[in-house]
Structure formats: structure tokens, C-alpha cells
Amino acid sequence: MFLRNRYNYLALVFVSYFIFIIYSIFSLQILNSDETIKRIDQQTLDVFYLTPPRGEIYDTNNEKLATSSLEPHLFINLRKINKDNIDQYKQYLKYNFQELKNSDLEEIFSSKEILYLVRNINDLDYLERQALQELDAFEIFDYPIREYTYMNIASHIIGYIGKPTSEDFEEFPNTIKTGIVGKSGVEKYYENQLSGKAGEVVFKGDEIVDFILPESGEDLYLTIDIETQIVATESLLEGIKLANENFESENIIQKGSVVVIDVDTGEVLTMVSLPDFDPNKFVKGISSFDFNQLNRIEAFNNFAIQGLYPPGSVFKVVAYWLAENEGLFPDGISSRSNRMKCEGNLSFSFIDGSQQVYNDWKEDGHGNVNLSSAIQQSCNVYFWDIALKIWRTYEGNENESILQEYARNLGFGKVTGIDLPFEKSGVVPDRDLFEEWTITRPELVRPEGWLGGDLMNLIVGQGAITTTPMQVASAYKTLLTGYSSAPYLDKNIDSVQKVKNYDINDDFIEFLLSDLNLVTNKDGTAYFAFEVLGRKANDIGGKTGTAQNPGDKNNTSWFAGVDSISNPKYVIVTVVDEGGSGSAVAAPISRRIIQHLIGEDLTPVKFGEITE
């Protein structure tokens, strides 16, 4: 009896345990079946991402520079293509879209994508589009088309777009592989802002089960004034044409740049680089021939921030500042007003007794000059004498690089920080750099290293120094305000960080403006270029520069100026690579741009007097 009850008890326990197991399984498979099915479904869903429209780009006056329009595009659902219908679809595409080559068809039907974008069908009428949709594998979706309103104008500022590369995916992780990405200019720099959020076409198997619209990118408002940009581009083209007509050069003169920045804020009003390109050519894919042609003439280089040139005499304002601030004037001169005799050359003795002679650009000399007239007439001898004094006073000690420190204080030798990609820093040479180059780039330096002659080259903007037009504009801005700040293009930038330069005071700024004004008036190197302005020239200032290039290359033409002496608003810098004399080419170009800035009627760019 006891044994039988024990067996009954064990049986009851076993049955209870079995019922519990069955209930648990039932709960998982039946009671939670909705969640289970949902989870299984999710595991079989695939997503194709649709490219979103990019944000619009506007100039400072809300003029549209770049826009995106949605146009119907034909896509093919490759999951509905099989061995039974592939030839039918190939023949259909080949017959109806005759621009498609056999290689295009092979690319389409060998793709691993779910959907493949075949072409824009904006040229088809309603009935033709309906006919396409009767074929099961065809889908029609809106796809954004980028359009650049002003074509080549401001192309280096705006940039262009293209298919993403592995480098793009690394830099912008949210980029979709079937999308587009900014390749240069603000299109690249502000990619995350402009790109938007991709749409989604959700597939279960070969059927579309959900669709999420893409979201447009944010709009971008620039500091650029497109009207000034057009005037600056036209003026630079006129000047380059004149340079080709008046100078003999081994190369066709075609490279140049113009920069106009706000003296107070650093806003970039205009930035031109030539040769340029039409970014619209990249929207549907540029041909290899066209790309190679543009690449050959360096049309994709933004010479305003990537062109590295010796600055020539526009660099003399650095020595001007140093002389004023440190009291470092030529031998026997104790102030800015004292004069020295310039006879057209500077001669001095080496330790071994041999003579070195430096010849000024003006063979018969400038006569009696002080700091003001040395800037006005661009007297090399005056500044060479300052370099010689620095060398003899400081050779071998920590102050030997005092000129270089003043240059770096103005931003030479480092990027300005403008909101554009690929900016270059340039070079401010000194003893340490030459020692480094002796090891790394021995072809650039002499075995004896840094010498006094290198300092004399540097003080007049020659030798190993290289700089960009934007650096020169930024340096002049600092000298004219006493504050340094990065130039910028985004009009809605959160804040502009201004750094006070305590070595630049109001008296210095007043002296500099007055002396720059001498350059554009009687006896100044830019007088002929600005003579057409008459009395208006009394309120304009600048500095010409003619920089020698190595080998058989023609000189580089420079002008750096300000639109008003009494109330400076803009700094203007013009460079023409191999353009010759700064007073003959760059100054007349700048004059026409200044005419626009001050509201004067425009007159043609006229070849100026060759000085320097």
C-alpha cells in the first residue's frame, strides 16, 4: 500500500512537470507569436537608401548659388531579374535608352545592389513613364539633381560633388554608397550640414513593403557677394589677357587669384581662382577627357589658399612694422622720418674682404628716402639695409630670426583657418629650416646653410619664402586693425575669435594707412593704375609687388590694398602667376575691383607702368 502511494506521488510530480514544460513552450511559441513573427520578419528585411536633396547654398544677399531639384529617375529592382527575363529587360533598356552602351548594361545587371539607378527620365512624358511601370522590375523614384546657378563663377568656393570613395566613407561615415558627397569647396567642408538624411526603400524578398522619404540637408548662407565675385572674375580675366599681350613668357599666363575680405570681421566677400571649372559637369558624371583637360591646367586648385608664391614687395609691410616697433632702421637712421641716400645698390664686404653688391630694381636709385618713401617707391636698398643691420646685430643668437617671428605673428607660414579644405601653409625660412632641409631636401639649400644673403632676400619677399594670397590678405587685415582672426565663408558662424596684437597700436595703423596711400598717388608705384580715379585715389592705398621666380618663369604680379584710408572696410589682394610687374598688371586689376566696392563706374583694366 505504501509503495503504491509512493508510485502515485511520483507519477503526479512527473505529470505536473510535463504540463509545465508544455505550457512554457506554448507561451513562447503561441502567446508570444506576434513578437516572434515580427522578429523573424525583421531578419528578412533589406533596406535600399535613397539619396537626399542637399541643402541650398546662398550668397550674402540670399542669391541662390547651388540648389537641388527632385526629378524622376528609373530604377530597376534586380531581385526581380532572373534568367528567364534578363534578356527581355536588357533589350528593353537598349531599345528605349539608346545612349546606354553594352558595358552600361553589363554593369547594371551584374550589380549586387537591390535597386540600380538607370537614368533620369525627366524627358519622358506621363504615358511613357506609366508604360515603364507596367514592367514588374521597374520602379520610379525622385532623385535630387544638383544645379550651380552661376556655373564657373565661385566654383572654387562652392566646390563640386561626386560619387563617394573609400576616403569619403572614412571621413563622412553617414554617407550612403549609392549617394553623392562634396569633393571640394564648401560642398566638402560643410558636407555633414548639407547632405541631409537618406530615405529608405524597405524590401521583404523582392517586394517593397515600406518607404521613408529622404530629408533635405540644411541650407548654407555664405559671406560671398556674387556681384563682386563676377566683377573680380572679369577683372582678373582682363588683366591676364593684358599680361599675355605685353609680356614674353615661356608659358601661357592663365593662373591668378583675387581675395577680398572684410577688415573688421574677416568675412570673405570675394575669392577668385583661375583657371576655374563648371561644377555642373560633375552632377551627371564628367568625362575622363574633360576631367584630364581641367586637371592639366590645374583648374581644381584654389590658388587663393593653395597657390604658393614668393610675395615680393607686398611683404615689405612686415619689415615696415618691425622697423617701427623695434626701432631697427638702416645704419645711421634713428627714426621713420630720417632719410638715407639710395644710389641703386647696396655694397658690403664679406669677412674675406670680397664685395657683395645688391642692385635695386631702379638702377639709378631712389635718392633720399625714409620709411614712408621706401614703401611708396618700393626701395629695396632701404629694406636690405635693415636686413644687414639685423644680421650684424643678432647673427647666431635668439634674435637672429626676429623678422621671421614678426612674419609668423601675422600668420605667414601657417594656414589661416578658413572654412575650406586643402589650405596650404607656405614657408617662412630660417636657420633651423635650412638645417632640416640639408638632410631632407638638400637640393633646396647650399651646403653652407643659412646666410645673411638669405635674410636680405627674405626682407623683400624673395628667396625661400612662399605664401598664399589669403595669408597676405589676412596679414594686411591684422596690420590695419591690430586684431587677428580667421577668414570665413559661413555667414552664420557662431562666433569670430579676435586676438588682440599688442604690438600694433593706433599710431602705427595711421602711419601705415598714410604710407599705403602714397603708393597709389603721385610718385607711387601704383600711381598710373589708379590715376583714372582722380581725387578718389586720395582715399585708397596699397602695395605693389613683383616677385622673381626660379628658372625661366616670368615674375609674379602682386597687389595688396585697402578700399579706403579714412574708413577701411575691405582688404583686396590680387596675384597673377607669371603676370610680370605688380604695378602693370595686379594693380590695375585691383583698381577696377575697388571701383566696384566704392560705387564708382567701372573702367577697363589698363596695362600699368612697369615698376619694381
Give the positions of each predicted feature.
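Beta-lactam-recognizing serine transpeptidase/beta-lactamase-like catalytic domain environment
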Residues: 64-66, 200, 207-211, 224, ...
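Periplasmic/cell-envelope proteins involved in peptidoglycan metabolism and beta-lactam response
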Residues: 1-286, 401-409, 553, 575-612
